[in-house]
Amino acid sequence: MKLFGTDGVRGKAGDFLDAITVLKLAKAAGIYFRKHSTTNKILVGKDTRRSGYMIENALVSGLTAVGYDVIQIGPMPTPAIAYLTESMRCDAGIMISASHNPFEDNGIKFFDNHGNKLNTTCEEEIENIFNDMDLMQSEQVTGRDIGSSKRIDDVIGRYIVAIKSSFPKNLTLKGLRIILDCANGAAYKVGPTILEELGADVITINNKPNGFNINENCGAMHPETVSNLVKEYRADIGLALDGDADRLVVIDEKGEIVDGDNLLGALSVYLKNENLLKGDACVATVMSNKALEDYLQKNKISLFRSNVGDKYVLEVMKEKGINFGGEQSGHIIFSDIAKTGDGLASALQVLALIIKSGKKASEILNPFSLYPQILHNMKVTEKIPLEQITGLEEVLKPIRQKGLRDLIRYSGTENKIRLLLEGKNKKDVEDAMQTLIAFFKKAL
C-alpha cells in the first residue's frame, strides 16, 4: 500500500486515513524510529481539525504498542513540532495536519530527532514495514514494555521564546498595526501572542477554531479578507497563515497581495545586506518565476532550484550550504531559525525588513515585475510517464525555441497533470499553452 505523498501522508479522514490504517502506520513508524532510538520518546501535535482527536488516539495506540512513550502537546504549528522535537530530545515528532486543505482532510507528517522532515528513503522504509504483517506482529510488546502517554499543555512558551529570539533585539513592532489571519488553525493562540509581545497593535481574525472551520474561506488560501481589512483599518501590513502555520501570505498597506517570488527576492537581498545570507545564494522551486532568478542575479545572488515541496527546498539548502529558501506558495525557510517552513518566523523577518528600510511594505516587498506565467491543471485518467508520451518533445521544441520556460509534472496527491509556461511575451505564453492543452487532451 502506497502511503506517502509529496508532504507526508494525506487523505480524507475516516476514509483513506481511518483509525486502523493510522494505528498500523504508527506501529510501522515506531518500529522504524526504534532502530535509532536514544530517548524512547515521540512528540505528537496537531492542528484544529475535529478528526485530529481520532488520529491522535490511533497514533498513541500504535506507538505505545511497540514500546514508545508519547508526549501529546495539542494544537501547535507544524514548525513548532519540528523545533520542539529537537528541543525536548525526542526520537521523532509527528504532526497531524493537512495544512491548507479543508477540514474533511487530514494528514501525518514525520520529523526525525533533529526536527527535519523524513526523506523519501526513510518514508519508503516505513511503508515497507507497514506492508510486512509478520514484522509488525513480531515487534509488538507486552507487559512492562508497553509505552506510556502523557499530555503537556505548557510547551507553547518554549516555541514563543524561540521565535521571538529570531527578531532583532534592537527593533520593536511598536507603532505597527497588523492584521493577522490565523485560518482558525494551529497558530490561533501563538500567533497573536508573539506579535503583541513584540509591541504590535494586532487585529486578529479567524482565531476561533471549532474543528470544522479551519481554512474555510480564510487564511493563506483566501487572503482577500485580510486585504479588505488592511484598507478598512489602515493597517501597515496584513499576514495570512494557513491551517498549520507553515505558510505565510503577506498583504501590503494598500491591500495588495505580495507575490511569493517577490517576497523571496526582497528577503534575499535584505539578508545579504545584513551579512546573513550564507553563500550569497537562495533556493526556490522549479515553480518560481524566472524574473526572480534575473533579479537575484543583478544583486549578485545565486539561485538554485529544487522540486516542489519545502522538504526538497531544505534538501538543496543543506546540499549547497545555504540558509535561506522557499516556495512561491508561501513556505519560507530560514534554516538558522527553523527546520521547515515557518509562517510566524517568516513574518518577523518581513517585519524586520520593513522597519529597517524605513519604507512602506508596498515600496520594499515588490522589487521586480513577474514574467507572464500560466499554470493549467488538467484531470487525467492515467499518469503515463512523460518520457513515454509520443510526440511530447516535438511539441515542446518550438515552444522552447521561443525562449519560453516549461514545467510539466503530475500532481503528487491528485489525478492531475500540471502545465506551467512562462515567458516575457504574454501572447506567446497563451498561444503555447493552448497548443499544450490540445496535445495532452489527445495524449492522455
Curated annotation (Swiss-Prot):
GO terms for biological process: carbohydrate metabolic process; peptidoglycan biosynthetic process; UDP-N-acetylglucosamine biosynthetic process. Activated by phosphorylation. One of its GO terms (molecular function) is phosphoglucosamine mutase activity. Keywords: Isomerase, Magnesium, Metal-binding, Phosphoprotein. The active site is at residue 99. Mg(2+) binds at residues 99, 242, 244, 246. The modification Phosphoserine is found at residue 99. PROSITE patterns: PGM_PMM. It comes from the Bacteria. It catalyses: alpha-D-glucosamine 1-phosphate = D-glucosamine 6-phosphate. The keyword Translocase does not apply. Its cofactor is Mg(2+). It is an enzyme of class 5 (isomerase). Its EC number is 5.4.2.10. One of its GO terms (cellular component) is cytosol. Binds 1 Mg(2+) ion per subunit. CDD domains: GlmM (cd05802). Catalyzes the conversion of glucosamine-6-phosphate to glucosamine-1-phosphate. Belongs to the phosphohexose mutase family. This is Phosphoglucosamine mutase. It comes from Aliarcobacter butzleri (strain RM4018) (Arcobacter butzleri).
